[in-house]
Amino acid sequence: MKLMICTSNKKKFEEISSILESLKKDENLDLEFVKPPKEIEVEEYANTFLSNAYLKAKAYYNAFGIPALADDSGLVVEAFSDNLERPGVYSARFYKDSFGSHVLKEEDFKLSKDELNNLKVLRLLEKEENRKAKFVSVVAIVLSNNYGIFGEGELKGHIAKEPFGNFGFGYDPIFIPEGYNTTLANIENKDKISHRRQALEAVFFMLKKML
């Protein structure tokens, strides 16, 4: 069976396909992981990770008729979150969010999106004692018009004082997982503990029962 991995983020595609290949090998399943024939624009307007993952997977399934896997994931910082988890579903574009926008200066916008997001989190936490945070990932697989399966993963930790490490992407350089004294971006085998792996393992467990 072909399974389409729906993301335009090259690093995310590599991480997801690598995890899935290792799971497939362990179970000796007949699965082929493919990129979509072309990228399509999907408006992720929902306010939960689950809904956004489903929206993307369903849109790609409808476009190409191939079983589709999509992930929506993000960082949740306890000190920023009251009734709304932040950055949460807005993690990829947190630097644009009006929440805390005063901490970014005009000259900062020469940085990459990932660097801007990390910088904003660090500046907002400069005088904050509570640095607890967690990564959340929800994976959706749409197998037909009427059937989908879901898996969720969570990795708890806290925010570092400064970025460190060259592995990973996104908020990995500023996130220290529980039980570690370095950032996720400095852990070479981070895929073995990541929130995304947990979500993929959960959904893979359900998928293998159907094959």
Curated annotation (Swiss-Prot):
Substrate binds at residues 7-12, 73, 169-172, 190, 195-196. Keywords: Hydrolase, Magnesium, Metal-binding, Nucleotide metabolism, Nucleotide-binding. It comes from the Bacteria. It holds the Pfam family Ham1p_like. Its cofactor is Mg(2+). GO terms for cellular component: cytosol. The keyword Cell division does not apply. Binds 1 Mg(2+) ion per subunit. Its EC number is 3.6.1.66. InterPro entries: dITP/XTP_pyrophosphatase, ITPase-like_fam, RdgB/HAM1. Homodimer. Belongs to the HAM1 NTPase family. This is dITP/XTP pyrophosphatase.
